[in-house]
Amino acid sequence: MRALSLALGSGGGGGAGGRGGEFDSLRAVFARLGSRARGLGDDCALLPFGRRTLAVSIDLSLERVHFRTDWLSFREIGWRATAAALSDLAADGARPVGVLVSLGVPGDGRWTTDDAVQIMSGVGAAVRSVGAHVLGGDLVRSPRYLVDVCALGVAERPVRRSGARPGDGVWVTGRLGGAGLALLGLRAGHRLPPALRRRFAQPTPRIAAGRWLARHGARAMIDLSDGLAGDVGHLAAASGVRIMIELQRVPCWPGVQPRGAARSGEEYELLVALPPRFGARGALAFRRSTGLPITRIGACTTGRGLLMTDNGHLITPPRSFDHFPAR
């Protein structure tokens, strides 16, 4: 896979500051809701549920926007869509209970009953992998395939995006860049190595990691779906802090350079702000419990936004994914 080595160039910082076409549009929608809107902009809606908190997330996957049927099997499409919704629960430290699924299939004769069965087989497999259940759903005719997954979970100590404080360390689970490397390979028509294909087609929602971090002092957390640079910006904006990222510290998938890792989206690892006392011993305990590495890549300071350095040199953060980029 040397030809696919990911070293994407940097662009502007529009997505990195919690802004950009998509997020400006969301802010405009939220403003219309006024005082009726509560807690919008987090990974999940969080509702009191007895002594615990109910976490609810919804995630839409649309053909030719989030997936292509010539790249993924229908079972992989179902798994991937479900993992995206479950990853939001992980970011809030929640335990999944179940999902509701709306499935849209083309009315132009392209689909068969088996296609829908295979999509739902992938949904079911992803849900079972985290000990949850499919609770129901809907089947409709659609111009394109779509899978809309609503995930429900419960949290003992929910973690929002808004709790980071100056002095906190910024950590990331796993390794970054594999999803971006896989996407380059698919676009080039390459056959992907099994591990790399799984990274893209069957990502693992970090449920156990999110729950462990919630129990061990996580102050703010977000899943990396839009790319490191963009999601750091979202967490910084929600918490009202400046986050400084040292790019050379970012743990990368083999064959991926740090700038490429910072731009790669749909990684579904967790970015978390932890108090200063969390250090090497905490990282070792995390790995022993979850089987995942966790790496400190930066810190929170006073101020606003994102600063990114590469071996001590200030750089422009790479652009992250935006559904509605500025033209």
Positions of PLM-derived features:
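Residue-level recognition of short, solvent-exposed, well-ordered loop/turn junctions
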Residues: 165-166, 208, 263
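Short, compositionally biased
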Residues: 180-197
